[in-house]
């Protein structure tokens, strides 16, 4: 039976596809290729909707409180680090958007590369540290409650997991180098 942690791990694999697509956009710009402006809108929408509003919000509003109930502090340790990285990621997306609006390819590439690096390392921390802590601390009852919280959070958001997975695959096929 899949646990809520398994769901978060699966979402990471989807986000990694989008990160490869974003890195591919950077490589194309570095080679002097033209990139369709819609590509930027599409990747930003995916990162803001799926990675941040769907995935990060399930962590921040569901998983972290469940871990807090088990004594894991929110403001320091692994959760504190993860929260700071979520904020940094949001700031980098804003930077990328400003760079695209200003037609500043170098600034976009710098922010996008920083975002890819940040999220790649961030995912490794969650997969190998935070989620293992969760699997150790959360009993079956807590996992069921967490699953209920995830279901409620997802019901409030647009789109299905399958839709986002397809979107990430399409972007990766189109732009990853």
Where are these regions (language model features)?
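Small-residue-biased structural context
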Residues: 1-177
């Amino acid at each position: 039976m899949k646990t809520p942690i398994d769901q978060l791990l699966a979402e990471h694999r989807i986000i990694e596809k989008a990160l490869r697509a974003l890195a591919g956009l950077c490589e194309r710009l570095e080679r002097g290729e033209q990139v369709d402006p819609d590509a930027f809108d599409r990747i930003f929408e995916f990162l803001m909707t799926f990675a941040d509003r769907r995935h990060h919000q399930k962590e921040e509003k569901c998983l972290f409180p469940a871990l807090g109930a088990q004594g894991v502090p929110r403001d320091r340790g692994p959760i504190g680090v993860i929260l700071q990285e979520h904020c940094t990621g949001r700031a980098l997306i804003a930077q990328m958007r400003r760079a695209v609006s200003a037609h500043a390819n170098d600034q976009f590439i710098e922010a996008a590369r920083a975002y890819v690096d940040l999220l790649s390392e961030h995912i490794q921390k969650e997969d190998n540290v935070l989620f293992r802590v969760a699997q150790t601390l959360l009993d079956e009852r807590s996992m069921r409650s967490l699953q209920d919280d995830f279901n409620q959070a997802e019901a409030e958001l647009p789109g299905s997991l399958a839709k986002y997975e397809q979107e990430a695959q399409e972007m990766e096929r189109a732009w990853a180098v």
